[in-house]
A protein has these predicted regions:
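Eukaryotic intrinsically disordered, low-complexity regulatory linkers and tails enriched in Ser/Thr/Pro
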Residues: 1-96
Length: 96
């Protein structure tokens, strides 16, 4: 299932590593350093013209780092609700 992150960006729920609120997480120096390093590597993509509220870390096999970070104007609470609004696929056991 795909989750709309804002603007015209949607990602597969399986590729989302984490959804983080910028107001609370950027209080940590480690988070600020992580985002700064990702920005330098070109792994940060802003998908908003407004002040971002959330950053979303996703797997991206096309990038050298293996991940991409989206900055979104949609709150982390809303994105989390969207991610759980669809049922998770059941694992099917092989009948051998």
């Amino acid at each position: 299932m795909y989750i709309h992150l804002g603007q015209d960006v949607a990602v597969n729920r399986k590729d989302i590593i984490g959804i983080f609120d910028l107001d609370t997480t950027t209080n940590s120096k480690r988070t600020r350093d992580y985002l700064a390093a990702a920005q330098i590597k070109g792994d940060v993509v802003s998908i908003t013209n407004e002040l971002p509220k959330t950053f979303i870390v996703c797997r991206d096999k096309t990038r050298k780092s293996g991940k991409i970070i989206y900055l979104s104007q949609i709150s982390s609470a809303t994105l989390l609700k969207r991610s759980w609004s669809f049922p998770r696929p059941e694992k099917q056991e092989d009948n051998i």
